[in-house]
Amino acid sequence: MKSIISVWIWIYLVFGGIFVSANDVIKWKLAMTWPSTLKPLASPPFKVSEMIKEMSGGKFIIEVHGKEKHKAALGILDMVKNKQYEMGHSTSIYWKGKDINTIWFTTVPFGMTTKEQYAWLYYGDGMKYMKQVYDRFKVLSFPGGNTGSQMGGWFRKEIKTVEDLKGLKMRIPGLAGEVMARLGVNVTNIPGGELYTSLDRGTIDALEWVGPGMDIKMGFHKVAPYYYTGWHEPSSELQFMINKKAYEKLPDEYKSMLKTAMKAASADMYIENFAESAVAWDKMKQDYPNIKVKSFPLPVMKALKKSTDEVLEGYASKNELFKEIWENQKEFMKKARKWSLIEEYGYIKTTLGVE
């Protein structure tokens, strides 16, 4: 054992690492916005915890706490910043009240698809901007999973014109809520546990959640027959957060383990959600023929796009960094979208109907 430890000491000294004795166990806690049972949103933290334990031989333990434990679903950033928890899992758009620039690391209406966004994050300037935005919180942020393109929501009545949006009571948070509000929608943000009852009783007329994999479990189809395709969250990225000081104290190999595990868990969650939604969509079409799947008419979509641009331009006029990130994303998306139209959409369009 002594000879093995001596070898490790030599390796750390040579390569500038930080030595952790074979008897030391590093224990971290991770707080997430979601209940522990809400898969696949809650899947990435557990995946990271399992991978880290296995890769470190049980010497690096990350204990995962769902919101049922810490009771502060929207307090994750503050808890990680203040080192109540070394890590957190949430979504960046929840911190728009602290810094509007955080929205760019979740999604924006009419923005990039999941693959386009990951390409921007990892092979464009995305991670550079993420670091810049989160530095002020003394927190490191990393991609933490993705729901893919989300559905546009459940509606009690059909939306045929822009006028139909006026006076509509809808649960739709974040930037999309601001966009809808400009078109006369009465926007509200109701906790997930109250959504079904609110829709059933007519407290709200419509809501957006995620997609068929999660929506059918909530039972929305029982009280709102119109299910609209999306526009507002073309790629909804989650995030891991790490307290900067806690991270800096880690040995280099543990830092590498963390980055590897987070990246793997992030990709796995996207695949898990896609698979779950594909199965749920097929089952939904068979079991609930009363559901009317719709897309918003072109005039409504144009109004939503115009409203989106106005909201973004409003923030850009007051915030130089916001404007810079927006321009950077648009430039990247211009190239990425051309390939998306060929690589996936082109294939589907070309082979559609071929048996």
Language model features with spans:
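N-terminal secretory signal peptides that target proteins for export/translocation
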Residues: M1-S3
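Bacterial N-terminal signal peptides
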Residues: S6-G17
